[in-house]
Amino acid sequence: MATPAPEVLTRSQHARRSRVIEAAMQLAGEGGYDAVQMRDVAARAGVALGTVYRYFNSKDHLLASALLEWARGLEANMGARAMPAGETPVDRIVSVIRRITRASARDATLFAALVTAITAPDPSVSECQAEVQRIVAAVLSVPLHGIDDELREGTVRILAHVWFASLLGWVNGWTTSVNAVGDELEFAARLLLRGE
């Protein structure tokens, strides 16, 4: 069943959809991925279970949509700021990486649930993955303004891959904390931009 795109919803539908996402995020923050059950989401959001399924095909689609909303907020926050602090492209990208890592670490239980969902092999989740990837690329491109286009695009692409792999490692217990994700990203950025 196809779900309506957020941009074609009425104001009241958009408000209900937002309440559903907020309820899912609260449950995920309280108990992680397994704590998010669609019936509980509906009850917390104050909507019928059918309403939840009208907007989201599955729990993974719901949580992936929540991560997408989080990423959109991050993009808006980063876009509202001036060029990140730092004299060099490396310093600026490390500043951005550390800000994003701190934002992720504020609610590690929630963020782990969102990352778990975004990896699901669900076509609806794939749409969220593509948009999150676009946002990550946009956010990482800003601090690299002024360097060679090919180097910037390659650096952004590789950092996005390292970020995703590091997040998977963190969620699956291969690394100790979400801060370790930031460490790996910083190391990769310094390697890729050596001499810039």
Regions found by a protein language model. Name each.
Residues 46-56:
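Short hydrophobic/aromatic patch on the recognition helix
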Residues 65, 79-106, 182:
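Hydrophobic alpha-helical connector segments
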Residues 101-123, 168-169:
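Amphipathic alpha-helical segments used for helix-helix packing
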Residues 75, 121-164, 179-191:
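Amphipathic alpha-helical packing segments from all-alpha helical-bundle domains
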Residues 63-70, 118, 125-128:
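Alpha-helical DNA-contacting segments of helix-turn-helix folds
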Residues 37, 109-115, 126-127, 178-179:
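Short, hydrophobic secondary-structure boundary micro-motifs
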Residues 1-31, 35-44, 61:
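Basic, helix-initiating cap at the start of DNA-binding domains
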Residues 78-85, 114-121, 170-174:
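Secondary-structure edge/capping motif, primarily at the C-terminal ends of alpha-helices
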